[in-house]
Amino acid sequence: MSSRTICKSGFDATRGELLKFRRLGFLLSVFGSLGVLTLLIVGFAWSRAEKHSSSMNLTTGFDMALFFLGILTLCICASYTAQEYTYGTLRNVLVRTPSRQAFLIGKLSALSALTLLLTLYTFLLSTAISLFMSGRHGINLTPSLEGKALLTTLAHCLNGFLGTMALGIFGIALGLIARSPIIAISLGLLWSLIIESALGGALPRIGRWLPTANFESLAQSGATGFSYIHCLSLSAFYLLVISLPALYLFKQRDVSQ
């Protein structure tokens, strides 16, 4: 297929994938749970902060909420990718769009758009809560919304999207490999929440080299012991490592069965 045909097929596939997110139940559950947890996390963080404390800033609550957003994105991406095999819809999709490359472009584009929307939603909600709570603690956060500080704040939001999307791509790769939503989600959560935590606790020196830790640090524009370049480079490396076998299996597997 020509590049022009692939682009057109990819655009059509993206539009088709986006239509899957229009279900009211899905939107209410995702945005509702994310909104409630963001409110609780940011509100709790500010309730424990001392008055006139310098440890709280405009993006502190956003950084805390990013952990749940990343896990949620991983689960959504893994589920929406693997269910194409479980429900047998991949075969029907490839009949209309024979190019598997175009299908992956559509899947990745749609999930990226959803992740961007969820990141902006979390950022705006956490910012609104922080601005409201800061007044009660005698902290002025409005300078963070002016001049160069605003650009820094927006860059922080962009990094939040990049780190969250890294977890999303990790979920997509697991979905392609496992071909089962339950298995893909279980593997993602097992590695991210249990195995990495155990490895980081038992061997602190390797903590800064683990994939999920770098994804999360990238989302927070770098963290203690994690430079931004370090997080960005390792995140790209780990995504390449997990994506190559996933793409190979997706290309070679027979989807007619």
Protein language model features and the residues they cover:
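Amphipathic cytosolic juxtamembrane alpha-helices at the membrane-cytosol interface
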Residues: 97-109, 187
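Secretory targeting signals
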Residues: 2-7, 26-27, 31-80, 104-178, ...
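Helix-capping/transition residues at the boundaries of transmembrane alpha-helices
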Residues: 20, 82, 93-95, 171, ...
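Transmembrane helix boundary and interhelical loop/hinge segments in multi-pass membrane proteins
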Residues: 77-95, 100-101
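Short, membrane-interfacial amphipathic segments enriched in basic
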Residues: 1-15, 206
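Short loop-to-helix capping motifs
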Residues: 24-25, 98-100, 179-181
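Transmembrane helix segments
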Residues: 43-48, 178-216
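Short cytosolic juxtamembrane segments of multi-pass membrane proteins
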Residues: 252-257
